[in-house]
Amino acid sequence: MTTRGTKSALRPPTSIETTDAFAADVDAGLTAKPKRLPPKYFYDAAGSALFEQITRLPEYYPTRCELALLHENAAAMASFFPSGCALIEFGSGSSRKARVLLGAAATVEAYVPIDISSDFLQQDAAQLRRDFPHLAVYPVIADFTAAPELPPAVAHMSRVGFFPGSTIGNFEPHEAAGFLRRAGRLLGAGAVLLVGVDLIKAPDSLYRAYNDAAGVTAKFNLNLLARINRELGADFDLAAFEHHAFYNAERRRIEMHLASTKRQKVRVCGVTVEFRAGETIHTENSYKYSIDSFQALAHGSGWSPLAVWSDNMFGVHLLRVTNET
């Protein structure tokens, strides 16, 4: 029997553990050639709030298209969910999309949002408990790209995975395959997984989505440097860096960079990092797939495609795990 009601999140890493990992990743990324930073660090409280603004921008079609597909097809998607299951969301953010599924799937008894942003996750979990009083909500503060520990309360429940937002595209293809294999092990034999995937399309639509007129995406990108200043005591001059986003047609991905506007030196984690004028920090990729190419990736990663709901912009894939990988 599932225990209902409020539950605290699994113990998050201590602030020292979190800061040490952040510092190590920043040091490794800024001393690499070319320079890079992991996109998971976008999502502190300020970054998470900025991303929520991005999802409501007129240029940013992925959220709008995915929500429409979910609203139109939630009942069909939920028909694949086993009775008494737990819905596990990877990188939950505001859980806006999970709410669509929760409203359509009476078979879901527990919801486990996994997210790296502690404050944002706890606030959203509290609101979910108010909105769905008969649903057990177990937030897990963790990096979902690693191997998060699920709450003991869902250990014996069937599990449905949910990975919306085209976040799968932020991984290199081999990393996406690795994530899918780990998700299969976490969710267990016979589990199903819903994945949102951005489709290949005209470059101008892609460009506008990542270069909005209001400049919110630029603020989101630059907030990564602001976070490094706040948490690691660096001295980045945000006015000396610019947001650059473009479509790399050969690799079928959007690339986001922060470009230095001048020759400069920045002190980070006790190390002096030099930048040439025009040199960039590569902060994110967003790979685009055809329906067939994503299903081939899934099939090679231990999943069998069951269904796909799509328009000409976006696709939501339903997969079933085929083997323990």
Where are these regions (language model features)?
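N-terminal auxiliary segments of SAM/dcSAM-dependent transferases
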Residues: 2-41, 48
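Class I SAM-dependent methyltransferase Rossmann-like catalytic core
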Residues: 34-81
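Conserved class I S-adenosyl-L-methionine
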Residues: 84-93
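Conserved SAM-binding loop of SAM-dependent methyltransferases across substrates and taxa
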Residues: 94-107
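Conserved SAM/SAH-binding beta-strand->alpha-helix loop
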Residues: 114-119
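A short glycine-rich, Lys/Arg-flanked "PGG" loop and its adjoining helix->strand segment in the class I
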Residues: 177-189
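Conserved beta-strand signature within the Rossmann-like core of class I S-adenosyl-L-methionine
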Residues: 186-200
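Substrate-binding/catalytic lobe of Class I Rossmann-like enzymes that use SAM or dcSAM, i.e.
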Residues: 205-287, 291, 295-301
